[in-house]
Amino acid sequence: MSDIENPAGDTRPIGVFDSGLGGLTVARAIATALPHESVYYFGDTKRCPYGTRTEDEVRSFALQAGRWLSKHDVKIMVIACNTATAAALRLAQQVLDVPVIGVIAPGARAAINSTRTRRVGVLATNLTIRSGAYTRAIQDLDAGVDVYGCPASSFVEVVEHELASGAHLQEQWLENEDIFDTPAVRALVGATVEPLRDHGIVALHRQLDAHYAA
């Protein structure tokens, strides 16, 4: 959570916004890294998933969430939704009266740090892929990394909302494995990452690494 500044003496809460419940993993990470902070969470479960929404709709939803969090006097807003980060981060930073950060930049840094072949595959919602947000974020940090985007809204929806068993999630993953026809060893899933650990995707990552390293 190095992207969150913590001014001394500012006891206001940190606001976290997501399209559903997946962002609770981000809230937990903040609580672990900054145990003395309070966190307010806004999960838009009524209108999720965002991956099938238009960009204008997602922007509107993000601003509504931001204004709600502002009314609760948060000192910073974390957009814990990749789709909302891609569609609305810049607008929210311009319009809202609190600092706003998203999750794409940290995800891009993690992808660069973990790839051994300088090739990254991105599985994300159609809107996130169309925005080019991950490609820009990764190549702004390292222009030598090749980025392969794969729209996979159904897979991301399963991941973010933990709607399936491990077997179902692996099936969804394999349905989208065409992206690995290119040697994109490290897959960056445009969704909250922690739930993946419970569904065997980490093991799939290791298999991919071993395959392309061979």
What spans do the regions from the language model cover?
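Non-catalytic structural scaffold of enzyme domains
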Residues: M1-A214
